[in-house]
Structure formats: C-alpha cells, structure tokens
Amino acid sequence: MRNKKLRFALKEHHATRLHYDLRLEKNGVAISWAAPKGISMNPQETRLAVRVPDHPLSSLDVEGTRRRGLYGAGEVLTWDKGEYEAFSVDDDNTLTVTLYGEKLRGIFSLRKKLGDNPDWYITKLEDEYSDRKFILVPRLKARKYRGFEPLFELI
C-alpha cells in the first residue's frame, strides 16, 4: 500500500563518532535510525541502521552545533533531504521506501533484525539510480581536537 509523499533527511552527525541519522516523517514525528556508515547507493552494500527514539519533525531541518553534555552533542549538517514514499511493512519486518532526494534517489529496503534488537539494515535496491561506485563523502572533516570537542571545517 502506497502512502503520500512525506519528508526525509539524512543528517551527518559528528558526535563522539561520525555517523548519519536517517529521519522519516511519519504520524507527526521523525522516525529515526543512526547509521554508523551512512547509506549507500550501491545495491551490493548493506549498512547497519540502529533504531533510535522518534524525534520532533523540526529535526528534519535542524543544522548546527549541540553543546557538549546534551543528547546528540556535536555538529549536525543535512547531507541530503527530500521526499519519500513508503510501502507497508511486510511480515519479515521490512520497510520499502522510495527516496526522492538530491543525492539519495530510488528504492531502499530497511529490514529489521528479528527479536527485540534495535538493529535494522538498509540496502539500496537495484534500479536506475543504483551506483556501484558510490562513495559517501562527509560534508565536514575534523581539523583539530581540543579535548573531546572537535572543530570542523566544510570540505
């Protein structure tokens, strides 16, 4: 069953470690996953996506620095954004979405690991947007460190 197009964002998050936050608008919140290695456009690469608590819809647009000591502290930038279409979750706990982003386009499968585990796996499905040479390049790079607070510059 197809739904109307809703918003999505992939956030580049330089916290304790660089990771990417996938956010999908649904029922008034942004359902969220933390993806340590981001999302690939290569159908041969499956990436881990750990389900995290839902975020407010405003998290789809937020960029900037969250100060140390707060949940999600660190630098956050939008790596990609756009709309998506979702299909029903099937019996295997798989959510199939079509992303219409600036960089992420086409059909992706999010498959939940069985049991109470928060782990999901995200894979690009083969379509006209697949790119077997895809390399996810961060927008920020660390230039130096003072204690645990990295300073960043745009690449």
Language-model-detected regions and their locations in the chain:
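A charge-rich, low-complexity, intrinsically flexible signal that marks solvent-exposed coils, linkers
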Residues: 1-155
